[in-house]
């Protein structure tokens, strides 16, 4: 590797072993669920970790990472470009950037310039703002494809943690339909996080049922973003196609977000 990354041999060794362990864990979860591990994406959550970690993960074969703050993600992309170019590994355009945090409508324009996928879309007004921003970015050649969208579902109706209230009849369907009918967005599927006081098995079972119901209306919405470091096995059992892993892969957070 070029000088910038060769200065981090210990970190590369750490991530190499952690990634291998996480891939083995995911494979075991898929086998236990009778599923093909190839249909489940392992998404490293790199918020509060430096661009050097993203570059090392890229070198190890990871092509997608998750961020939760627009300012941090934008700065990291610029630094990653420099690191990958120096290491002759390409550029950050080879990385698929996922927005996994809550999205403010006034950040839609910025998000449209860097994110490939958004996991936390949960309101009609946000869909409208993102659609408008992505269409503009496409027209200005700032991006080359639609924004992939997971509609976030709230299983208990508590809006403080984000998500469309799945206990309100028709609420999830309306947001999914709005995304499906938009010009700049592509409906990937649903995302959900178990409520704090719920058993994960019960939560993911309910999320899977909601996803199955949505897929009956929107057959292309095959994605289910569910499961993190402490519950990915349960999520995989209930159909997750994308597990979001942070500290179990990367260790303690190393940066403060800008």
Swiss-Prot record:
Keyword flag DNA damage: no
InterPro entries on file: Ala_racemase_N, PLP-binding_barrel, PyrdxlP_homeostasis
SS bond list: none
Residues modified as N6-(pyridoxal phosphate)lysine: 47
Domain of life per record: Bacteria
This protein's GO CC annotations: cytoplasm
Free-text function comment from the UniProt entry: Pyridoxal 5'-phosphate (PLP)-binding protein, which is involved in PLP homeostasis.
Family named by the database record: Belongs to the pyridoxal phosphate-binding protein YggS/PROSC family.
Protein name: Pyridoxal phosphate homeostasis protein
Organism encoding this protein: Mycobacterium tuberculosis (strain ATCC 25618 / H37Rv)
């Amino acid at each position: 590797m070029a000088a910038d990354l060769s200065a981090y041999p210990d970190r590369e060794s750490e991530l190499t072993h952690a990634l291998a362990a996480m891939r083995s864990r995911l494979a075991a979860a898929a086998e236990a669920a009778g599923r093909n591990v190839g249909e489940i994406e392992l998404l490293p959550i790199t918020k509060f970790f430096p661009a050097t970690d993203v570059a090392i993960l890229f070198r190890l074969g990871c092509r997608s990472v998750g961020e939760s703050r627009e300012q941090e993600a934008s700065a990291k992309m610029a630094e990653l470009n420099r690191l990958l170019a120096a290491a002759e590994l390409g550029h950050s355009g080879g990385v698929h950037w996922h927005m996994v945090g809550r999205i403010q409508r006034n950040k839609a324009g910025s998000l449209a310039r860097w994110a490939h996928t958004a996991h936390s879309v949960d309101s009609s007004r946000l869909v409208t703002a993102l659609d408008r921003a992505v269409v503009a970015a496409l027209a200005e050649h700032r991006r080359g494809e639609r924004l992939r969208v997971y509609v976030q579902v709230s299983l208990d109706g508590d809006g403080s943690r984000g998500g469309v209230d799945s206990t309100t009849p028709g609420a999830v369907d309306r947001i999914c339909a709005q995304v499906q009918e938009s010009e700049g967005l592509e409906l990937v599927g649903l995302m959900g996080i178990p409520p704090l006081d719920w058993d994960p098995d019960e939560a993911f079972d309910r999320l899977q049922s909601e996803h199955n119901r949505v897929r009956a209306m929107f057959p292309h919405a095959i994605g289910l973003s569910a499961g993190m470091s402490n519950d990915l096995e349960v999520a995989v059992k209930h159909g997750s196609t994308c597990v979001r892993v942070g500290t179990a892969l990367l260790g303690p957070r190393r940066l403060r977000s800008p």
